């Protein structure tokens, strides 16, 4: 009985979160449906599980975070992901963003610098029977050139500037969403959307954000 009540409460909290995202301007029904179909509580530790459907970031292992649901929804909506697209995610983290993307596109390739995080994320995706995500440990700043070009790229850590190696792995007409440090403004970041065109790139600044920094190389873990 208690378990059923807990499940009912979780579903109600999820519905309230989705309604809140709509009120904040998220309109893409496919994106909202994807978030509704991914159980966020599966991607966080038991300590914070009761906060799974509150609209804020939560800590995960290795000093990283699972992003605020609004930011996940906003970034995903701004990517305009199509069903047949191939998407690169830089920064697997808990695996939550990859799970959301998996509901929207043909295949997700995701890179994580922490082996511990990647192992746990892959297990969560397997438990949810998500089979269109390919993951590896690696340096996200280098992208995944063996699988390039990508229709879309999403970066879930803040870069000091737009990573050219990632831009180079976009298809022409492809989009990338990346948090970028604001030059001369300590600690400030802007979410930036990059479109690769035939003669260069178009850059559009979207909104202020706060992400953990994009760190080069594979993490050394004890």
Swiss-Prot record:
Chief place where the protein resides: cytoplasm
Family under the similarity heading: Belongs to the methyltransferase superfamily. L-isoaspartyl/D-aspartyl protein methyltransferase family.
Function in brief: Catalyzes the methyl esterification of L-isoaspartyl residues in peptides and proteins that result from spontaneous decomposition of normal L-aspartyl and L-asparaginyl residues. It plays a role in the repair and/or degradation of damaged proteins.
Enzyme class: transferase
UniProt gene name: pcm
Species whose genome carries this gene: Parvibaculum lavamentivorans (strain DS-1 / DSM 13023 / NCIMB 13966)
Protein's recorded name: Protein-L-isoaspartate O-methyltransferase
Cysteine disulfide partners in this protein: none
Molecular function as annotated in GO: protein-L-isoaspartate (D-aspartate) O-methyltransferase activity
Location of the active site: 67
Pfam families recorded: PCMT (PF01135)
């Amino acid at each position: 009985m208690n378990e059923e009540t807990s499940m009912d409460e979780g579903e109600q909290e999820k519905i309230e979160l989705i309604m809140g995202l709509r009120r904040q301007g998220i309109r893409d029904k496919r994106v909202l449906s994807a978030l509704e179909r991914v159980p966020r509580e599966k991607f966080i530790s038991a300590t914070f599980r009761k906060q799974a459907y509150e609209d804020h970031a939560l800590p995960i292992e290795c000093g990283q975070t699972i992003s605020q649901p609004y930011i996940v929804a906003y970034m995903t909506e701004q990517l305009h992901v199509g069903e047949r697209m191939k998407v690169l995610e830089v920064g697997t983290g808990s695996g939550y963003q990859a799970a959301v993307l998996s509901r929207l596109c043909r295949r997700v390739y995701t890179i994580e610098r922490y082996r511990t995080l990647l192992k746990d994320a892959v297990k969560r995706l397997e438990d949810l029977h998500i089979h269109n995500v390919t993951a590896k440990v690696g340096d996200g700043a280098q992208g995944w050139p063996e699988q390039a070009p990508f229709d879309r790229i999403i970066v879930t850590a803040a870069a000091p500037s737009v990573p050219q190696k990632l831009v180079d792995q976009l298809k022409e007409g492809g989009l990338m969403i990346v948090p970028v440090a604001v030059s001369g403004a300590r600690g400030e970041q802007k979410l930036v959307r990059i479109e690769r065109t035939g003669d260069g790139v178009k850059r559009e600044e979207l909104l202020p954000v706060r992400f953990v920094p994009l760190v080069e190389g594979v993490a050394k873990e004890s």
